[in-house]
Amino acid sequence: MNNILVINNEIKDYENEYLSIVNNNITFKKNCDYSIYYENCNNVNISINLLDNVYVKLFEYMCDLEVESNIVYNISDSATLLLFKFYANKNVYENVVINLNGYMAKVNYNFSNICIGEEKYKFIINHNNSNSISDISNKSLCLEKGKIDFDIDTVLEKGNIKCSMNQDTKIINFGNNKSVIKPNMYIDVDDVSARHSSVIGNFSEEELFYLMSRGINYNDSIKLLVKGYIFSNLVVDMDKRSKILNIINKYWR
């Protein structure tokens, strides 16, 4: 199993042919598939670096924590990060910085979470080179006492041409939650493809009616929609899927 454990805010130094870890800096040297699990953390600071021409599929998992985290992703020439991330925490304040430093650097960031307490996510995506691509997808379920805030900045400065950027953030509320999405794109170039979408709401009555018309009761219908929503943003193996299903079953019985 290619697992990286962040325990008490620290990662043990380690090196193999695919990666090196020194002082909470993870550097991927070859194409690989890894998972990061956060345990007993409250103040996380890590850097994740992809060298030239490296393709990394990464899964991040964090559950039942009260945590402040700062995570920086640095992506070099022709490197690609495919990230799937699942959180279900008590309270979170997270800063995410994605630096697309290389020519044709690419990130595909897919985040699903269950918001139980108070959460704030600040994203800064820097397109620091030409032909770089960012695709950011956030899907959150905000429970009755939850409160969530997404602040997302995509930055493209003059001189970096033919870039593509996308922000897609959706929050499903259960109750009268205070949820906020602030999508921002700061672009100083004409030759660019840029798109953002922000939605805050509930599961549609049509979806619920369809499921209930098939003989599924209300609670089970909601649970099916929750599962579909969470997993629509994640590509994970059966072990990870089972772990996430256990969390879903905890809140939707």
Predicted regions and their residues:
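Conserved beta-strand/loop scaffold segments within soluble protein domains that form the structured core
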Residues: N2-F209, S213-I216, I230-F231, M238-R253
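Short alpha-helical scaffolding segments that buttress acidic/His motifs in well-ordered protein cores
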Residues: L224-L225
